[in-house]
């Protein structure tokens, strides 16, 4: 969530918005003293600081190269570093232009000494700019070399996979051994370049500005802050003084930036000698810290943002002590002393967000240390638990820095001094054309090719992965079985002919020559024969493309959500243990079983095309003007396989059409798989992979809801019960992955209890495919429901079959809203979700349960269609005992009617809920549903739940409503506040306590300062 505005901050000369600490029940004079302490700016009690700490001994400069390269992370850090260096250049160029203009104006009326000093300053800036330009060129050179090694490694990886699908022969084994040696060499080169690039990142200077707390900071409180960045550590202790000021035993630390690694911050309140209370623990992304201006950062330490750690972070592109040769030892010491004195002007107190006295002029040492003389860039961080470790940025100011959110929280920076166009380059991403999914091969403006009869018979079109059309529609996209059979047939004919191929340097593209020599006339015939026999369905691949990330991403997202709250509940500890066990099982799987079991479709062309970028023949470029080789054309060029080259290749070699597949692996980077295997983490069974990902994501969602509802025990208890069932699912998934290596042909082996519910088992068997027994798409389940039960449901409830089936699927997936038709094909239902849902509802016969559900849907549609008097009559007839339990769909519809513009309908529903709440059974179920709805992300449902709780007079929900009163959405805050005030004396007291500190402070000064608050 992005919150930003620009206006003057009254918080003091340093500009950080002060949080007026909650005064509790102390006297008026003490409360007034605390509030005033946030605005005054007198000097604080200060503990002596010996010298600036620096992590040279633990930094990356003395560390060994990483064991595995991280190309995606390197790309992200390179982009951020390049933008930061460019910003430094821009800042200094602006200052140079200003001084040059000033020099021209002063030549006539100034003394020689003044001109000499000004000219000397200009030359200093010019020298520093030349150094920056040289540094940029060095970084570009390293990154370009890294990209070349990455493509070589990627090509070797594809060759390994292509040989793995071919029959074993002596020549093949020798070639595979050579490829393995090359792959290892390329990997080592990438790691070495990463280590060298890491040395060019400069350093981060982090200055402690103090804690800001809402209702938390009281005189005498002692806190310990522990920061970890790779192998670098910084621990400091502080105390809140009586006058609201703060004293800390540490003031500044220098961290050396890392390519792989995030800043971890843990804040602990020291209660006594052996009593420590963990306030919060967060992880911070560092990419956006590469900026020319000092940045003031407010980090949300706890979930509600009531404790914030304020830091001032400055990035230096060069080591502070790594001076230019022209500067002697005296200058180096003087520069360091000046920098020390600048940061030691006062001990941190409760901070403010603007420092008007920062730099009025450019100091001399700024060009030695790399510090830009510009106004600080204020920003704020707010960390919250998100599914899969992802974050969502709401639309912010036009000049805010855009960025894609990944596995960790990111920093969003707003600078009002840079024009919007200057940051447009941030949106440019590097596209690696070396790996692609089957759906990425489609091109616009092409017509599908009509297949001959003999070719279309038995040709199964995979669901979710259609046969793509292209600039040359004659190309066919084959499945793994086809590619493997082609390689086997080609290699078995001449098993001893696997030897180096002589290439003509004047003939042209390397891939063209290799494919021309390696393809034969018999292969297309074999292709037609195999295609006519049919292909295996690739529904799992189509569904996987819609899932958010890989197994690694799902594991990381859950671990990130669990980490700060692992000790809060026993269920969290059990879940963490089971998930770690499953992760260990997958990491220990043999690489051979993965490469042969996963759905890869590699052929000679797709592997050899990886090396096209090595073709630098000038003669070839002159011979064929349509072919472009972009090696050396910039940082992006080494990843660019132009469509022009591929199209011209298809036209030159018509005999190669029709049998060469372009379906590559989804991810050929080195991940967390075993022993340098190029394949990602997998069980070896695509359906099982999808199932594990879905349950990991669902567990992440449950953990977040439990944390949010932890203050309301009956809601948390219900969610913990759901989580317990997921822990049992994780145990079964671990057993299946460990014992059977993912090769299960019957769902009974995964869930032995299924044989007791034969009707449910029979229906599931119809929904899934033979190779995907663990999952099915929601679309497929609904179609099977229509085929099996539509006539029965429509007979008793005409026209309700479709909404009944959609409602059932939504409930199986535990969704608050019905699924949209467009999302059905991308939603995955696992066999464990299917079995768990019907077991928890005591269902053994699907047909009878659908009739019950149809009755519920009938009531819902009746309520939605009636108005005023008819609605009042309908809800009056709807007695609380009409159903065995108040159904979720009915409760949801009643709540949503409260949000409508029809006052008569709202009044009718309010009267019904008030009357129905007298039934203890109804009230218990309704209270649980509406309180759980408050934890959902749907704002409309949250608002409706608040109004329903207001009608139920649910004082049990006060704590959750207090949390909702601090929402970023004003409408939700208002509705939650109104609901609180309607809940009698307890609600009024809770609202008054909430209102004792300014709401703007809860929003981290969103209305008072020029800042950005980002929720991760």
Curated annotation (Swiss-Prot):
Keywords, ordered alphabetically: Cell adhesion, Cell membrane, Cell projection, Chemotaxis, Coiled coil, Cytoplasm, Cytoskeleton, Differentiation, Hearing, Membrane, Myogenesis, Phosphoprotein, Signal transduction inhibitor
MF terms (GO), sorted A to Z: 14-3-3 protein binding
Record's compositionally biased regions (Basic and acidic residues): 444-454, 643-656
Ranges where the record places region Disordered: 44-73, 414-469, 636-656
One annotated Gene Ontology cellular component of this protein: apical plasma membrane
Compartments (UniProt record): Cytoplasm; Cytoplasm, Cytoskeleton; Cell projection, Filopodium; Apical cell membrane
Biased composition (Basic residues): 48-59
Compositionally skewed regions (Low complexity) per UniProt: 433-442
A GO biological process held by the record: muscle organ development
Pfam family of the protein (one): PL48
Chain positions covered by the region annotation Involved in cell filopodia formation: 55-113
PTM comment: Phosphorylated. Chemokine-induced phosphorylation in neutrophils occurs in a PKC- and AKT-dependent manner, resulting in RIPOR2 interaction with YWHAB and stabilization. Phosphorylated by PKCA, AKT1 and MAPKAPK1A; in vitro.
Main location: cytoplasm
Modified residues (Phosphoserine): 21, 37, 341, 520, 532
Coiled coil: 85-112
Polar residues biased stretches: 414-428
Function: Acts as an inhibitor of the small GTPase RHOA and plays several roles in the regulation of myoblast and hair cell differentiation, lymphocyte T proliferation and neutrophil polarization. Plays a role in fetal mononuclear myoblast differentiation by promoting filopodia and myotube formation. Maintains naive T lymphocytes in a quiescent state and prevents chemokine-induced T lymphocyte responses, such as cell adhesion, polarization and migration. Involved also in the regulation of neutrophil polarization, chemotaxis and adhesion.
Subunit structure: Homooligomer; homooligomerization is regulated by RHOC and leads to the formation of concatemers through the association of N- and C-termini. Interacts (phosphorylated form) with 14-3-3 proteins; these interactions occur during myogenic cell differentiation and also induces T cell proliferation arrest. Interacts (phosphorylated form) with HDAC6; this interaction occurs during early myogenic differentiation, prevents HDAC6 to deacetylate tubulin and also induces T cell proliferation arrest. Interacts with DYSF; this interaction occurs during early myogenic differentiation. Interacts with MYOF.
Name of this protein: Rho family-interacting cell polarization regulator 2
Organism: Bos taurus
Protein's gene: RIPOR2
